[in-house]
A protein has these predicted regions:
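Outer membrane beta-barrel transmembrane domains
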Residues: 49, 57-67, 202, 207, ...
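Outer-membrane beta-barrel channels and translocator barrels
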Residues: 43, 89-91, 101, 131-135, ...
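Outer-membrane beta-barrel biogenesis signature
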Residues: 20-64, 71, 294-295
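Transmembrane beta-strands of outer-membrane beta-barrel pores
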Residues: 40-46, 98-104, 143-149, 174-176, ...
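Outer-membrane pore/translocation modules
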Residues: 102-201
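Membrane-spanning beta-strand positions in outer-membrane beta-barrel proteins
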Residues: 28, 35, 87, 93, ...
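Residues on the lipid-exposed face of transmembrane beta-strands in outer-membrane beta-barrel proteins
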Residues: 38, 82-86, 96, 124-128, ...
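Residues that define the transmembrane beta-barrel architecture of outer-membrane proteins
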Residues: 76-80, 113-122, 160-166, 200-206, ...
Length: 295
């Protein structure tokens, strides 16, 4: 069960940075303005993209094939993300994200249902708009701090990972006004530090987010997003390279945002996996409420 818990945990890893799009891609806030958002996330999964070849249905299942969890397993995650960005200048923003997780995993080998809940790992961000023409280009850096409770217990999906991350992201954005269209592209590299408690380096990651949006009238925004993550293998006990912990996932996320007036908007999304490796498969539902505040 230890190995099973490891690959389930990686679902939670992406949740810490995935289900919400931090403020407006490459755009930065005007000086003195505050942008806030609270997002609810829910996922129930009984399938995953396998991490290693398996034998099933009379044949070998290749890495990345979508298969049911062993022993009728089912993973459920509920999360709430609170985040805020503040414009220090017209070009420089700082941001904060605080997640709350409630996660559990059950299968036919257990009489109980192991679960964990609580505040997860907090993230801090800074964004600097380098240029504005002919398109926006922004550099974003971030860190994930091990503030969540990491539990190395059989069957538990912990809310914290017990290690630091450092993100480096380049973002390009373009408005196509007078057409009511915009596009964003972000590509980042995540340096993942060792979890000293279990002597495990989870492996660095590349990640990306591509997004296009169109305004329908003055209040409705339709969006289409592609998101992905690719990781290196983990290194266990100082020198053992564990390729079964390589992670891959690609999401398609159609979403809509409805302006409620006064700088407030409601966003709804359905995030679906297209392919992966060592990752939960299926759909994720999100609902977010954002608000902006002037000086």
């Amino acid at each position: 069960m230890k190995n099973l818990n490891k690959y389930i945990l990686w679902t939670g890893v992406l949740l810490a940075c995935g289900p919400t799009t931090l403020f407006a891609g490459a755009w930065t806030l005007p000086a003195g303005e505050l942008w806030t958002k609270v997002t609810y996330f829910h996922q129930t999964a009984d399938e995953w993209y396998i991490a290693s070849p398996e034998f099933g249905n009379g044949q070998i299942q290749e890495v990345g094939e979508r298969r049911p969890y062993r022993f009728n397993g089912q993973y459920e995650s509920k999360a709430l993300f609170a985040e805020a960005f503040y414009g220090l200048t017209d070009r420089l923003d700082i941001g904060l994200q605080v997640p709350y997780f409630a996660q559990e995993y059950a299968d036919d080998t257990r009489f109980d249902t192991p679960s964990d809940s609580g505040i997860g790992d907090v993230r801090l961000f800074a964004k600097w708009r380098v240029i504005s023409q002919p398109a926006l280009f922004t550099l974003k850096v971030g860190t994930k701090m091990p503030t969540g409770d990491f539990k190395n217990e059989d069957g538990i999906v912990p809310v914290g990972e017990g290690q630091w991350d450092f993100d480096f992201v380049g973002q390009v954005g373009r408005s196509f006004w007078p057409l009511p269209l915009y596009a964003n592209l972000g590509v980042g590299y995540r340096v993942r530090m060792k979890n000293v408690e279990v002597d495990r380096d989870p492996g660095d990651e590349w990640f990306y987010n591509a997004e296009v949006g169109i305004n329908i009238g003055s209040r409705l925004l339709l969006m289409a997003k592609f998101e992905g993550l690719r990781s290196d293998p983990s290194v266990d006990f100082g020198s053992i390279k564990n390729r079964s912990q390589i992670k891959r996932v690609t999401y398609f996320n159609p979403a809509l945002s409805v302006g409620l007036g006064g700088g407030t908007a409601l966003e709804l999304g359905l995030r679906s996996t297209l392919n992966g490796r060592n990752f939960a498969a299926g759909h994720q539902l999100t609902a977010g409420l954002s608000a902006g505040f002037g000086k």
